[in-house]
Each structure stands twice: as C-alpha cells, then as structure tokens.
Amino acid sequence: MPKQLKEIKEFLLTARRKDAKSVKIKKNPDNVTKFKVRCSKYLYTIVVTEKEKAEKLKQSLPPGLQVKELK
C-alpha cells in the first residue's frame, strides 16, 4: 500500500533519501498532478492541485533522481 504524504517539504525530504530510486509524475486533465517517489520499502505519493506548485516541485527534485512523466 502506498504512503500518501500531505506536505511538499516532507515529499522533498523523502525524494532526497539514499533509497529513493525514481519519481513518476502523472498529470490529469483537470489540473491535478500526482508525484510518486519509489523508495526501497514504500511508494510515496503526493497530490498537488495547483499547476504553479507542481512546476515548482518538479524543478526542485534532486538532479540524480530518474524522472518519468506519465500522461
């Protein structure tokens, strides 16, 4: 079962962990963006409803992380 995070700061800390492997970004037509970070034990997700916040979060992801965008 994936773990849903509420805070963007908490998500960024999770994405910077050593066991974080990749991030998937899923965009829905009604301005809902889901970020999913795969760690060794859990898949952590966060739902962002604002387009500007989603773009900011995408830019602040760690550079060494593999990012995959889904439709």
Curated annotation (Swiss-Prot):
<comment type="similarity">
    <text>Belongs to the eukaryotic ribosomal protein eL38 family.</text>
</comment>
<dbReference type="InterPro" id="IPR002675">
    <property type="entry name" value="Ribosomal_eL38"/>
</dbReference>
<dbReference type="InterPro" id="IPR038464">
    <property type="entry name" value="Ribosomal_eL38_sf"/>
</dbReference>
<dbReference type="GO" id="GO:0003735">
    <property type="term" value="F:structural constituent of ribosome"/>
</dbReference>
<dbReference type="GO" id="GO:0006412">
    <property type="term" value="P:translation"/>
</dbReference>
<keyword id="KW-0689">Ribosomal protein</keyword>
<dbReference type="Pfam" id="PF01781">
    <property type="entry name" value="Ribosomal_L38e"/>
</dbReference>
<dbReference type="GO" id="GO:0022618">
    <property type="term" value="P:protein-RNA complex assembly"/>
</dbReference>
<dbReference type="GO" id="GO:0022625">
    <property type="term" value="C:cytosolic large ribosomal subunit"/>
</dbReference>
<protein>
    <recommendedName>
        <fullName>Large ribosomal subunit protein eL38</fullName>
    </recommendedName>
</protein>
<keyword id="KW-0687">Ribonucleoprotein</keyword>
